[in-house]
Amino acid sequence: MMVIRPVERTDVSALMQLASKTGGGLTSLPANEATLSARIERAIKTWQGELPKSEQGYVFVLEDSETGTVAGICAIEVAVGLNDPWYNYRVGTLVHASKELNVYNALPTLFLSNDHTGSSELCTLFLDPDWRKEGNGYLLSKSRFMFMAAFRDKFNDKVVAEMRGVIDEHGYSPFWQSLGKRFFSMDFSRADFLCGTGQKAFIAELMPKHPIYTHFLSQEAQDVIGQVHPQTAPARAVLEKEGFRYRNYIDIFDGGPTLECDIDRVRAIRKSRLVEVAEGQPAQGEFPACLVANENYHHFRVVLVRTDPATERLILTAAQLDALKCHAGDRVRLVRLCAEEKTA
């Protein structure tokens, strides 16, 4: 059974293996053991209540409960940009016009922005390619909403997600090549690694501070503004179906889109509810997949179960109860895994 649980110190080697499979561009999962160990420690201290909000971050892993294999990782940053500035480009417009010459030009322009400062962030989503099946990707991504719904007071009103931009298998980023490299004088992979290992001072020191007309970029770079890496397209679709939208903010390195949503408008958060569990044989039938999570802050668990999402009493097997660290009579959080398709 696939189970979402909080990260543990013993997961570091498994996270190193996952990091080696990302192909670059996932800034928050560098193949650097010291950085990953520090990330785990920060997550543990967050759960223990030892960190200020500006440093808090939760990390979860997807584990096969039978073999102990760690198949994926996902995380939530509680409030971004309160220690180090949080940069985006806002894609806006500057108008240049002259009535006398009968000229009017509306030019797409990149403005350096810190507008998302203080937002909660969904980040570090990666599923081992060998495990991209049977709803694992949905479970990994959406499990975070169950945690946010259960412990709403831990998070801010807006939640954002930076999506991986267009980068090829050799680490070539058209956006970086046309813009970032001119100011940072390094390859994309180097800048990405520095950022992922916490060495972010260079961003503030070297970032262009003035608006940038996108027409000055190569056509290839212009074409990838706000676009996602092909492997990230499914993750973007998942978030958009939960209510997230692209509001013209992009990543300063690869030009990938930043999606955002008011936390209380996220479908899985808004529609999740508490039901009582009992032990037994679940009813047979064509039921949809549902997320089921316990309400245990320190021992949080999420699994996928096929059941009636409208039930008031959830029947689970002994194995499912054990995976959830629950007992009969406990209350668990339940929501349909995917939004119901609207019928005409």
Curated annotation (Swiss-Prot):
GO terms for biological process: arginine catabolic process to glutamate; arginine catabolic process to succinate. The gene is astA. Catalyzes the transfer of succinyl-CoA to arginine to produce N(2)-succinylarginine. The lineage of its organism: Bacteria, Pseudomonadati, Pseudomonadota, Gammaproteobacteria, Enterobacterales. The active site is at 229 (proton donor). InterPro entries: Acyl_CoA_acyltransferase, Arg_succinylTrfase_AstA/AruG, Arginine_N-succinylTrfase. Its EC number is 2.3.1.109. It holds the Pfam family AstA. It comes from Escherichia fergusonii (strain ATCC 35469 / DSM 13698 / CCUG 18766 / IAM 14443 / JCM 21226 / LMG 7866 / NBRC 102419 / NCTC 12128 / CDC 0568-73). Keywords: Acyltransferase, Arginine metabolism, Transferase. One of its GO terms (molecular function) is arginine N-succinyltransferase activity. Pathway: Amino-acid degradation; L-arginine degradation via AST pathway; L-glutamate and succinate from L-arginine: step 1/5. It catalyses: succinyl-CoA + L-arginine = N(2)-succinyl-L-arginine + CoA + H(+). It is an enzyme of class 2 (transferase). Succinyl-CoA binds at residue 125. This is Arginine N-succinyltransferase. The keyword Cytoplasm does not apply. Belongs to the arginine N-succinyltransferase family. It comes from the Bacteria. The keyword Acyltransferase applies.
